[in-house]
């Protein structure tokens, strides 16, 4: 499968490299999960999922919505995670930050890696998110 690239300034990064950079900036010493574009996700902008393979091993993955995150006709600025985003790249970054918080909590073996109080604390303290929901599309609780 070909790599999907994000343009950030003068460098072009894959989504996984972008996730790795966000994790490093947050000070989280964990490897990035696979991050994929999903053409079928039409209601939720991003989703963190953990699936079990045939051998019983759990695998985390972040899925991002092609229909929602590759739109170019949003009115700007767009509120994402309670923050004003002025371009599609900023929207993608906020969504990726949000999903990486779920991943971090899962990696830390938290019992609840959903929208818990710990999630809210990390969202605010690490990324400055004003809301624990994306604000684009709808999200499961």
Regions found by a protein language model. Give the residues of each.
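Walker B catalytic acidic pair
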Residues: 99
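Active-site-proximal or metal-binding-adjacent scaffold patches in catalytic folds
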Residues: 1-94, 103-141
């Amino acid at each position: 499968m070909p790599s999907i690239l994000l343009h950030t300034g003068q460098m072009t990064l894959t989504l996984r490299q972008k996730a790795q950079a966000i994790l490093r900036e947050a000070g989280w010493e964990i490897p990035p999960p696979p991050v994929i574009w999903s053409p079928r996700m039409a209601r939720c902008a991003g989703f963190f999922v953990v699936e079990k393979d045939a051998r019983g091993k759990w695998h985390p993955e972040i899925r991002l919505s092609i229909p929602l995150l590759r739109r170019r006709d949003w009115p700007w600025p767009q509120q994402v995670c309670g923050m004003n985003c002025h371009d599609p790249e900023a929207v993608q970054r906020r969504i990726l930050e949000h999903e990486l918080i779920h991943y971090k909590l899962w990696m830390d073996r938290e019992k609840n890696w959903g929208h818990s109080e710990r999630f809210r604390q990390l969202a605010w303290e690490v990324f400055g998110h004003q809301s624990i929901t994306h604000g684009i599309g709808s999200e499961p609780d």
